[in-house]
Amino acid sequence: IEASVLNCCTAFNWFCRNFYEGMDYEQINQILEDRYEKEDGVLCLPYFQGRGTPKWNGNARAAFCNINLSMEKHDFLKSLLEGIFLEIKSNIELLEAYAAVNHVYISGGLTKSNIMNQMQADVYGRKLCLSDESESTAYGALAVALKSLGVYASEEEGLEILLKRTGNTYYFPDEEKA
């Protein structure tokens, strides 16, 4: 099952291109690590090209709120990511109406950053699993299909077997932040 947060990586890239010109992602990650513990209060509604699931709205637009003159661009970057992750969390909570979600498998461009993965674990309040397998999304779809065909008792069993040859990195939520 997949949910949609429209243009989340595109919004991150846009922000970095416009506010961190000339900096590479390693430098940006370091800024996030340095600022992660800071409570700044900036809020971001990340609807740069509308809102995806669970409350589709093609006319929704992005906004940064709760801003004062002490804010810096780093506060906006952190709030952008938190806004994206909160949108994903709302999708996870929607899925929980149908099945327990004890941990979340993550993949994609933003998962190359340890600090962003930790931010996600903290926002979702769940353990995250990042597979070393670059095609983990395809394996997830295969596990669902094989479970429905009766090959495996559950998607989890299928993923465990299919991804056995790869390594995984786990991120655990900080209970104080979750």
Q: Which residues are covered by each model-predicted region?
A:
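Glycine/Thr-rich phosphate-binding loops that ligate phosphate moieties of nucleotide
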Residues: 1-178
